[in-house]
A protein has these predicted regions:
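Transmembrane beta-barrel wall of Gram-negative outer-membrane proteins
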Residues: 203-228, 241-277, 286-313
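Outer-membrane beta-barrel and related beta-rich outer-membrane complex signature
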Residues: 236-238, 268, 276-283, 319-321
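Short strand-turn segments of transmembrane beta-barrel domains in outer membranes
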Residues: 152-155, 163-173, 182-213, 221-228, ...
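Periplasm-facing N-terminal accessory domains of Gram-negative outer-membrane beta-barrel systems
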Residues: 1-66, 72
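Periplasmic N-terminal accessory/gating domains of Gram-negative outer-membrane beta-barrel systems
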Residues: 39, 51, 70-173, 183, ...
Length: 321
């Protein structure tokens, strides 16, 4: 988000968490906050010392009669200093054709340049010739060791619970480590702190439900989302005893709590738990799943210094019988 003073032609840009620092001379100023796709917000202030100024932007849409597209020289067409970075809009992902109608975040990445799928019915992907195990996948900063359900047919990410997805194909920042090919940084929704809302869907293989709302308006909010497949229910309806005793299903749960304690401190607690269960009569069984928890504390020391403290837990378990 761009935050600036029009009169002084001086401004700054917020970071990923919405924090910014802007130094202005004492006096009366008009401060503007602006971002593409949102309504511009202006506030009048009388600056006498250090102060905190928060903005809340509302989404906007504009109907255009005509759009003219023109290009610029390659050396002038620089919109970001981040190279080899792609961002996915979850709204666009939901519009893409998907296998059996199930929205899949990971498979949608294979539509981007430099990324290829490892094959149909598989959830892995290759980035610029690298192997699938060279991709670091994060969910609210917690590493995910197995990002698929049903042996790779679907990803573990419930699109209703995802806020945004960022993919680093090269020039990976130093804060990420442990992989050679790419980093997929998935962030969950923080919950609506104004009103309660629900989103859900019924698909061919699974159903899902997401609830969000304020715990305390303007201060704390929550988001909880669940999903379960029901292939095992259909198998039980078959008359063949070799099939109706088989088990094949998955389920997952996403949660997040956001609490703005005061102007200087914010807490975020998020979690994920998912499980796959597969069994062939009494002959063979295979269960696996992920569990992650992230606790982040954002603290502003002064107008120019802030810090993020994170406590991360990630676990992958499986059993073979």
């Amino acid at each position: 988000v761009n935050v600036y003073s029009p009169a002084l032609s001086k401004g700054t840009v917020t970071n990923a968490y919405g924090f910014y620092s802007l130094t202005l001379p004492p006096g009366e100023h008009t401060i503007v906050a602006q971002f593409i796709g949102y309504q511009k917000s202006e506030q009048q202030i009388k600056l006498q010392g250090d102060m905190t100024l928060n903005f809340k932007l509302a989404a906007s849409s504009t109907e255009l009669e005509e759009v003219e597209v023109s290009s610029t020289r390659a050396d002038e067409n620089v919109s970001s200093v981040e190279m080899s970075v792609a961002r996915l809009d979850v709204k666009d992902v939901k519009k893409m054709p998907q296998l059996l109608g199930e929205v899949d975040i990971i498979r949608s990445l294979t539509l981007l340049p430099g990324i290829s799928t490892v094959g149909e019915g598989s959830n892995g992907f290759n980035v610029r010739g690298g192997n699938t195990d060279q991709n670091l996948i994060l969910l609210d900063e917690a590493p995910v060791y197995n990002s698929s359900h049903l042996f790779g047919f679907f990803s573990i990410f419930n699109a209703d619970a995802v806020k945004d997805v960022k993919l680093y194909k090269g020039g990976i920042p130093a804060q990420y480590g442990g992989r050679l090919s790419s980093v997929v940084d998935v962030r969950q929704k923080e919950g609506n702190n104004q009103r309660f809302a629900a989103t859900g869907g019924i698909g061919l293989l699974s159903s899902r439900l997401m609830l969000e709302g304020p715990i305390k308006k303007e201060r704390a909010s929550f988001m909880v989302a669940g999903r379960r497949s029901y292939a095992d229910l259909f198998l039980g309806l078959l008359e063949d005893p070799d099939l109706n005793q088989n088990i094949l299903f998955f389920y997952d749960l996403n949660t997040k709590i956001n609490w703005r304690i005061n102007e200087r401190n914010s807490l975020f607690l998020s979690g994920y738990f998912g499980r796959d269960v597969f069994g062939i009569n009494d002959f063979f069984s295979f269960d696996w799943g992920n569990a992650t928890t992230s606790l982040r504390w954002n603290h502003v020391f002064n107008p120019k210094t802030f810090a993020n403290f994170s406590l991360i837990f990630s676990d992958y378990t499986y059993s073979l019988g």
